[in-house]
């Protein structure tokens, strides 16, 4: 598409050229049809001239009719809104000129008045349109001149855009170089590899002759040449270090921008060596440490800088421009970041090695602790077994003695011995649990017992203790005490003995008083020491208070101060082996309370125990009594053939006597292998096996499985196990091994008879 000014100039000259033929045709039309006969013949005759004019008018008319179509197409295809009106005027003018030429074709021959009238009208309209077009074109000329000015302005803007595009291309090229350098630098996390990669890539990008890195010394007094791209042929020892107070060094470290060094700079001369070189530039690089990235309050630390020196060749074709210096600055920042990451990685690796060493030490210490704990537990278990087995034997023998005929006084003493031995066995179990499992939790066994019998046995034991100590003893028991209550009989008996032992240990001479009575909690509510926790009993309950008082004689004083209370733990304050705090926890577990009150004169001290017991109104059958020891009739298994397996000689002998007391025919063996061999003989007709679960060579579970497997085709004998604990784990293993019954040690005559009776009845 041609420019707009040239187009309108062409349209204007076309209008002038087309107007002249129309005027000539109009003038010549006056002699149309006349021939003076003076013209020469041939081609220039009047007829030929008229025919040529007629053909010319037709061609001109056709051309005039086609030009408006082209102008209309141009106006619709181009965005010339202010100029569309003049285009339409030119189109109308050209159409009228073409119409004038078309009508003129009919004036070269004789014509009618209508032809002349049409020609006149066409010429008149052509004159009006041409005049209007000329006026419009006159106002359009300034706009066409402004278009020329705008064209020059656009050319200037195009040149500026070309310069900006060139600058953007150069910046993009610099950014590409920086990205490439950054990518190469960050490929490694080793500081030496990072520095060498930086020097190599900068040398390729900037066409350097040499590149060097100066690091501060450990003392911080000088800069040392540590890395360089090309080794110097001859090096002076003094050129390898530069003082820290060198002007160039100070100036470089003072700013983050790159600096072009002078030709006589000591830093530049030392970096290029003996070779001739071109301009030299240098920039600082922060040497960050991992400690700078730790959280918390930032510490004031002096920043350490390295210096990167870049040397150009001597040919003079290259120099340090803004783009090159900008690339160097960006690369220096990236190198500082990469070096900081490397420092963090090195410190984390050192920390990981330290943690690994500490972890190994902890594992070693844990292993040693585990071995020590196992050794301690083994020692405690052995010590516990050494104390428990004789106690179990004594309890078994005493249970047989209870079946003998004795007078009431002997019966009371025997029951007290049994009760004391049972409490001692329970205490040994508690000590073993708390020391092995490392906890202070004790379980309670709530069952129905005779409160009157417990008080009588406690009085009997206290009388023995006070008699051995040489202290007088008196007691008073309320007649309203219920006979049958529900609670932990062993724990209550132990707490009472603990209270007595604590007081008589503090006294050398005096009188010990024991008072047991019931009390009304509502009447004593004003006393805060009596406040008890409400027990979750389904039925009625009773509150019982045990009050033990010691009165020192006038000639002796209490060994402890009157202000001393029993609230703190003291290993020597209990004759039975448990501290006062442990007793207090046991009392709180039974919904009770225990406290002490001292006399203001220091001559007496009182310990009071308040407990809640659930009442049992129905008296149980003697055969189903829940007491640990009883005097009810023992069942007799006359002729029952029993094999007894126990590796402990004393317990085996006691259990053998108990079985014989029950009327059994007993064969005792010392190991599980002997038991299995006994069943191998054809004469073996044992109906019952009583075995200990904790034997040395072969435990009771394996023996039971072997017996079941060995007698698989025959009717297997019944098996009753003896165990120190009867928790759910032991019961599950007994059920898996095919054991029919389980008796918890110590084995007494009543417990053994009841369990054998139950097993024989169920099987």
Curated annotation (Swiss-Prot):
Which ranges carry the Histidine kinase domain?
Answer: 382-615
Q: Which GO terms describe its biological process?
A: regulation of DNA-templated transcription; regulation of starch metabolic process; response to ethylene
Q: Which reaction does it catalyse?
A: ATP + protein L-histidine = ADP + protein N-phospho-L-histidine
Q: Which GO terms describe its cellular component?
A: endoplasmic reticulum; endoplasmic reticulum membrane
SUPFAM superfamilies listed in its UniProt record: ATPase domain of HSP90 chaperone/DNA topoisomerase II/histidine kinase (SSF55874), CheY-like (SSF52172), GAF domain-like (SSF55781)
Q: What is its main location?
A: endoplasmic reticulum
Q: Does the record's keyword annotation contain Hydrolase?
A: no
Give TM segment ranges.
58-78, 86-106, 115-135
Cofactor names from the entry are:
Cu cation
Instruction: Enumerate the UniProt keywords alphabetically.
Output: ATP-binding, Copper, Disulfide bond, Endoplasmic reticulum, Ethylene signaling pathway, Kinase, Membrane, Metal-binding, Nucleotide-binding, Phosphoprotein, Receptor, Transferase, Transmembrane, Transmembrane helix, Two-component regulatory system
Please tell me what else the database record remarks about this protein.
Plants over-expressing ETR2 display reduced ethylene sensitivity, delayed floral transition and reduced seed set.
Say which family it is in.
Answer: Belongs to the ethylene receptor family.
Protein name per UniProt: Ethylene receptor 2
Q: Which organism is it from?
A: Oryza sativa subsp. japonica (Rice)
Phylogenetic classification of the source organism: Eukaryota, Viridiplantae, Streptophyta, Embryophyta, Tracheophyta
């Amino acid at each position: 598409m041609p420019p707009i000014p040239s187009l309108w100039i062409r349209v204007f000259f076309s209008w002038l050229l087309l107007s002249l033929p129309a005027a000539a045709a109009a003038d010549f039309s006056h002699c149309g049809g006349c021939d003076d006969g003076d013209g020469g013949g041939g081609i220039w005759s009047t007829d030929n001239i008229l025919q040529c004019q007629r053909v010319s008018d037709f061609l001109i008319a056709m051309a005039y009719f086609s030009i408006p179509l082209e102008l209309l197409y141009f106006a619709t295809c181009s965005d010339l809104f202010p100029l569309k009106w003049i285009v339409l005027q030119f189109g109308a003018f050209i159409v009228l000129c073409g119409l004038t030429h078309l009508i003129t074709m009919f004036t070269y021959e004789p014509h009618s008045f209508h032809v002349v009238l049409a020609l006149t009208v066409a010429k008149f309209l052509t004159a009006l349109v041409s005049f209007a077009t000329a006026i419009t074109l006159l106002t359009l000329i300034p706009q066409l001149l402004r278009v020329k000015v705008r064209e020059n302005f656009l050319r200037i803007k195009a040149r500026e855009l070309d310069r900006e595009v060139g600058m953007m291309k150069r910046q993009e090229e610099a950014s590409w170089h920086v990205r490439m350098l950054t990518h190469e630098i960050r490929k490694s996390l080793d500081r030496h590899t990072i520095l060498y990669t930086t020097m190599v890539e900068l040398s390729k990008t900037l066409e350097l002759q040499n590149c060097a890195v100066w690091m501060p010394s450990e003392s911080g007094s000088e800069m040392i040449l540590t890395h360089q791209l090309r080794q110097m042929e001859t090096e002076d020892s003094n050129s390898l270090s530069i003082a820290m107070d060198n002007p160039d060094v100070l100036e470089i470290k003072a700013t983050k921008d790159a600096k072009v060094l002078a030709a006589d700079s000591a830093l530049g001369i030392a970096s290029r060596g003996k070779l001739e070189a071109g301009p030299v530039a240098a920039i600082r690089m922060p040497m960050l440490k991992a400690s700078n990235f730790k959280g918390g309050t930032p510490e004031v630390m002096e920043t350490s800088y390295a210096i990167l020196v870049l040397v150009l060749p001597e040919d003079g074709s290259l120099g340090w421009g803004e783009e090159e210096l900008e690339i160097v600055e960006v690369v220096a920042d990236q190198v500082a970041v990469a070096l900081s990451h490397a420092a963090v990685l090195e410190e984390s690796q050192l920390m990981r090695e330290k943690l690994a060493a500490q972890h190994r030490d902890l594992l070693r210490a844990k292993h040693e602790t585990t071995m020590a704990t196992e050794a301690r537990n083994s020692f405690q278990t052995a010590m516990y077994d050494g104390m428990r087995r004789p106690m179990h034997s004594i309890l078994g023998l005493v249970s047989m003695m209870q079946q003998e005929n004795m007078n009431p006084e002997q019966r009371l003493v025997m029951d007290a011995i049994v009760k004391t031995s049972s409490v001692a066995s329970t205490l040994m179990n508690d000590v073993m649990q708390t020391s092995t499992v490392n906890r202070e939790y004790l379980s309670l066994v709530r069952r129905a017992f005779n409160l009157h019998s417990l008080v009588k046995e406690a009085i009997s034991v206290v009388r023995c203790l006070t008699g051995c100590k040489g202290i007088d003893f008196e007691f008073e028991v309320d007649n309203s005490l219920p006979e049958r209550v529900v609670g932990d009989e062993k724990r209550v008996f132990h707490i009472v003995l603990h209270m007595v032992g604590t007081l008589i240990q503090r006294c050398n001479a005096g009188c010990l008083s024991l008072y047991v009575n019931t009390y009304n909690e509502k009447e004593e509510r004003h006393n805060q020491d009596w406040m008890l926790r409400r027990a979750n009993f389904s039925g009625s309950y009773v509150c019982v208070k045990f009050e033990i008082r010691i009165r020192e004689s006038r000639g002796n004083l209490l060994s402890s101060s009157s202000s001393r209370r029993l609230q703190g733990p003291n290993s020597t304050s209990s004759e039975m082996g448990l501290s006062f705090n442990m007793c207090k926890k046991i009392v709180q577990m039974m919904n009770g309370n225990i406290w002490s009150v001292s006399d203001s004169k220091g001559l007496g001290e009182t310990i009071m125990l308040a407990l809640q017991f659930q009442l049992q109104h129905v008296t149980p059958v003697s055969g189903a009594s829940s007491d640990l020891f009883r005097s009810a009739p023992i069942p007799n298994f006359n002729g029952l053939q029993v094999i007894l397996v126990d590796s402990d000689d004393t317990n085996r002998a006691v259990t053998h006597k108990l079985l014989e007391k029950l009327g059994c025919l007993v064969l005792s063996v010392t190991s599980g292998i002997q038991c299995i061999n006994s069943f191998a003989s054809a004469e073996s007709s044992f109906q019952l096996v009583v075995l200990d679960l904790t034997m040395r060579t072969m435990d009771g579970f394996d023996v039971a499985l072997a017996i079941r497997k060995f007698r698989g085709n025959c009717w297997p004998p019944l098996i009753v196990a003896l165990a120190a604990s009867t928790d759910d784990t032991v019961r599950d293993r007994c059920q898996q091994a095919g054991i029919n019954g389980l008796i918890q040690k110590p084995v007494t005559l009543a417990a053994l008879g009841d369990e054998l009776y139950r097993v024989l009845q169920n099987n």
